[in-house]
Design a protein with these regions (language model features):
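Catalytic phosphate/metal-binding cores of nucleic-acid and nucleotide-processing enzymes, i.e., regions
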Residues: 1-137
């Protein structure tokens, strides 16, 4: 679990470096021009089980990320939900530390394209079978 938390903190630091801030961040705390937001989802209570750990909106494009530390395994419900999100036309990823650079490339495409295009769908397809798997089909 510590490995996943460390990876989550690394991801948050990267997101803020490109202008994706925690939802509700005050403008005067933003060090680069904002292009989106993220929110961390917490399990339990009134939350729906199996939702990805983080929800991001970058240039209007929704991205959901299920983080796993080294050796972590997604539940069947998590895999089902990721597939359903992708089949709905959004982007959902199962992200391991070894897939972080692939994730950054996907983010670069989202930031540069500013639209959900064929190129972004190709990036989703290219991520399959890596540490940054989109889990389609």
């Amino acid at each position: 679990m510590a490995g996943e938390k460390n990876f989550e903190n690394r991801l948050k630091k990267y997101l803020q470096s490109v202008g994706v801030y925690p939802l509700g961040t005050a403008k005067d705390r933003m060090t680069v021009t904002p292009i989106g937001y993220y929110e961390k989802r917490w399990g339990g209570g009134y939350s729906k089980a199996g939702l990805p750990d983080m929800h991001l909106v970058v240039n209007g494009i929704s991205i959901d990320v299920e983080l796993k530390g080294p050796g972590g395994r997604p539940s069947e419900l998590q895999k089902h939900n990721i597939r359903q999100i992708n089949e709905g036309g959004s982007i959902a990823l199962l992200l391991y530390p070894e897939g972080f650079e692939t994730f950054k490339e996907l983010m670069k495409g989202v930031i540069e394209c500013r639209a959900h295009t064929q190129e972004l769908n190709a990036l989703k397809a290219a991520s399959t079978s890596t540490g940054c798997d989109t889990l389609t089909g």
